[in-house]
Amino acid sequence: MSMQDPIADMLTRIRNGQAAKHVSVTMPSAKLKIAIAKTLKEEGYITDYAVADEAKPVLEITLKYFQGQPVVETIQRVSRPGLRIYKGKDELPKVMGGLGVAIVSTSKGLMTDRTARQNGMGGEVICYVA
């Protein structure tokens, strides 16, 4: 069976892994998934990520907990293959009043909503993380 939305699968693996208190989760690797993992690490939502170079590359994400509770409260896919969501620089959403982040795909690469606003760029809203 082919995977229709690999990004939604990645976010679901992170959500389920934290609900089950796993130390890390693994998934098939892709450039966009690595960019999302890098952004999540920079924002402090995951501890680390690594790509294992095998016949089929595997992305391993080390999950982060604070006092036994998952750091990621919600992680939600916004733009999907059947319905792409694009926002201009003035329309970019603030997740939880600025406490969370929206990951946005711009012409300059993947970045948070804050960075995109500072650079005066809009783009495709990939997901919300809080």
From Swiss-Prot:
GO terms for molecular function: rRNA binding; structural constituent of ribosome. NCBIfam families: PRK00136.1. Pfam families: Ribosomal_S8 (PF00410). One of its GO terms (cellular component) is ribosome. The lineage of its organism: Bacteria, Pseudomonadati, Pseudomonadota, Gammaproteobacteria, Alteromonadales. This is Small ribosomal subunit protein uS8. It comes from Shewanella woodyi (strain ATCC 51908 / MS32). Keywords: Ribonucleoprotein, Ribosomal protein, RNA-binding, rRNA-binding. One of its GO terms (biological process) is translation. Part of the 30S ribosomal subunit. Contacts proteins S5 and S12. InterPro entries: Ribosomal_uS8, Ribosomal_uS8_CS, Ribosomal_uS8_sf.
